[in-house]
């Protein structure tokens, strides 16, 4: 199965650690680089105290300050996809973090 932007996957992030991640990069990037840009899903903190670079996805948050690139073959199992509104929020936040919103 090919990972798509907005998917949630269980990933091998090294040191025998597995974590749910949100896939940010698209399938074209995956084919060309054989890597995926991902952000970990973390437990939500105290309500109303989440930084703007954390995007809420159900109970966990997508922690955009922890972006990383991993080989596509370390994406082990697809767990679903984020809602369109979540994907748009991630795209906007990444744009602000990288200055691409200008």
How would you describe each model-predicted region?
Residues 1, 55-102:
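C-terminal terminal-subdomain/extension
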Residues 12, 17-55:
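Compact nucleic-acid interaction/catalytic patches
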